[in-house]
Amino acid sequence: MSHLAAVLSLCVALSAAAAAPQRPPNILFVYLDDFGWRDAGFMGSDFYETPHLDSLAREGMVFTDAYSCAANCAPARACLLSGQYTPRHEVFNVGTRARGNGKHRRLQHVPGTATLRPDIVTWAECLQAAGYRTGMFGKWHLGTSPQEQGFDVAVEHQKLPGFEGHLGPDGAYLADALTDAAIDFIEASGDAPWCAYLAHFAVHTPLQPKAELLAKYEAKAPGELHDHVVMATMIQAVDDGVGRLVAALRERGLERDTVIVFSSDNGGYGPATDMDPLWGYKGTYYEGGIRVPFFVRWPGVVEPGRTAEPVIGVDLYPTLVSLAGATAPDQPLDGVDLVPLLKGEVPGLGERPLYWHFPAYLQSYGVFDEQRDPLFRTRPCSVVRRGRYKLHEYFEDGAVELYDLAADIRERHDLSAELPELRDALRALLEDWRGRVGAPVPAANPEFDPAAEQRALERARRG
């Protein structure tokens, strides 16, 4: 072959390679249950050990101001899978039952639904349509079946034979079993791009230790922030599984071709962990109940670092669809695509408002953490954050609370009386949003008994 012919042949080959469509990345999405904002080493825990998560976080982009769309499990997951705020899909609470004593509820609980409607297209369905093999492992919590809403393979934690909570037959541990299932799925996917949604049941109650780790944490000096031995074993079990998953990716040469996303469905379980300096915990709409750990790691694409850009669970839908090169459906989506931010193509997302709507009640665990209300973790409310300011609006009496999160992340200094113009502007923004998305506001409860509520409050405060 002449030199000229060889050069032309090489140019044609290079041109063809450049024109060939790039294979989309695999996606490993690890989503924990009741894992608090401070519960990982990379978020400051001084007792729980998460070396594998910490390593991934150092190599990815960590979002310090990341939020779940709800303060408890089912609505958070419905928002995540649908890309919609709660008023659109109407999964407002865990189950549709009212919480607490009916005589203590001034308003009627908006029932909503416990099932993600079949007409809502999930991001998993979008990925399926784009040629992805999809798998879901762990907690679904949205009724029907994951396989009816976009997952080729589904291993639901409640359907694993012989398991009671986190404990299985012959010493099996749930976090290990779910990790095994995810690894099996990856191995069976061949050359197809895949998305593994590993939705651990950990660290939800019942708090059950991984037995072989107990002695380690019983002998460990307690931290100033965390000291719960059983919780520590549960967290390490998850982290060890993450380490095994990364090792499996490396063995198969998939690490650089796999995006790893990590987050939690809501704040931590108040009686067992601490989100300090945040106030509140799972079930409250203070920062401790809705701010969650979140990072995205994709070697060579996502620039490592930390950002205080506020993001929220509904952002994951357009982000996952974008990462996969898939097509978004013709339905309302409330989030924004984070890929330009992850790639460093934009400096930020602008001062967009983030919203929460909870027209229901969640009964209290008990009196601790100087909580607002000893009877309910949360009463019916809406919340908005725009920039550094966050407004809570309560429907029972129309009360509002306004906080400057940059100066008062613990939400202890209510500015609603000091900044009336800002208060009214944020309240109007919230009312306008409720109108646009059809958010229901609960009506008066005919069973409410003010005297019974007062007696219950007095008993609770006395302990």
Identify what each model region corresponds to.
Residues 19-25, 32, 36-37, 62, ...:
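Long, internal low-complexity/basic segments
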Residues 23-28, 59-64, 130-135, 152, ...:
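Loop/turn elements at helix/coil->beta-strand transitions in domains of secreted/extracellular proteins
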Residues 159-164, 182-230, 269, 275-276, ...:
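Active-site His/acidic residue clusters
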